[in-house]
Amino acid sequence: MDARISPLAAFAALALLLPFAREATAQACSFTAAGDRFAQLLVDAGLPGGAILVGDRQGLLHERYFGTYGPNTVVPIASGSKLVSGARILQLIDQGVIDPAAPVSTVLPQFTGEKGTMNVLQMFSHTSGYGDDSGDPLLFDRTISLEQAVDEIACCRPLTAGYTVGGQFSYGGVSMHIGGRLAEVASGEDWQAGWQAHLGAPLGITTIDWQAFGATTNYSIAGGARSNLRDAGRLMHLLVNDGRSNNRRLLSPATVARLTVDAAAGLPVASAPPGVTPPVMYGVGSWLDGLGGNLRRPQFVHSLGAFGFFPWVDFGRRLFGVFMVRGSGGINAQTIPAYRDMLTAIETELAGGSCDWIERFDEIFVDDVETL
């Protein structure tokens, strides 16, 4: 009888033993400093509640609700929608449904002239030639469809004065609106239904939709989504785990890596939200920094929303999280310094020793195991 053990069998045996070894020496971290700072933020901002979620590739490390918030609390996530929408665009690129370099006119021929030359990556990185237009009423008109809104943009919304396609970074919402309609036409599916079928359902997500401000089919791609804490966390886990979650591969690692490519590098900054400080770094629907251009976290991506909702992924540390509040306009003058402090406190606690998971994910976490 051959007593040799194959490498795959040895790995499987080790995978069974490792959780028990960790559980014997580790316990859940309390993240007290981060929680205290968050609680102070809620008091200072006069907010009724909030929530914190922190995890890594293998499971959840911390989940806590404050005040009136609980597991069923759903809030508008404002610009947190950009990363949520960007994940669907990346999936369609991965599947070959969207060519990331193709001009928009190849799918939406109503876009002509220079604005017909922008591509979907430019649309989702604020480098398309549109921008400084987050408050355009067309994006939030619930009486029309996404198709009608984008036809109006093609007809009657020129590029922002003085802008060129690919010539500057200018934060806004119109270009992502166009990208959402491009996705509908290329895939043959309604935006919201497609997202829910191909990302939401496989991940067990039930609360994410684009109805944050009332029933509509004019989905505000860049700012109209809503979510509870756990569902946003499920999507962040997919990203931190290189496109695999809930025992499903939904994105390739190479496609997820696009999130950390700085599309704004070398471009003049024509407009940016309040509180954003140089250097401005932006990927696909997400900022590339640790809040305020903190270069200690060059592989940190986030999509902070105007109401304070903060989904984030730290690819360098293999962590993800969601800080959940629902404030009013201007709240981020208070959330940004608080979130900086919370991230530092979380990193410090994790660096101090092993933190056990409060919930394990049923996954295999070994690079390239799928190629064996």
Predicted regions, residues:
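Sec/Tat signal peptide C-region and signal peptidase I cleavage site
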Residues: F20-A26
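Catalytic-site signature segments of enzymes, centered on catalytic residues
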Residues: Y65, V74, S134-G233
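Active-site-proximal loop and beta-strand segments within enzyme catalytic domains
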Residues: A45-P48, Y69-G172, E189
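Ser/Thr-rich, Pro/Gly/Ala-heavy low-complexity intrinsically disordered linkers and tails
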Residues: F361-L372
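Active-site SXXK
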Residues: F38-A39, I52, Q58, V75-A101, ...
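Short, well-structured active-site flanking segments
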Residues: Q91-P109, A186-Q211, N247-P253
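Bacterial N-terminal signal peptides
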Residues: A9-P19
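Catalytic loop of the DD-peptidase/beta-lactamase superfamily, centered on the K-T-G motif
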Residues: Q27-R64, N72, E184-E189, A197, ...
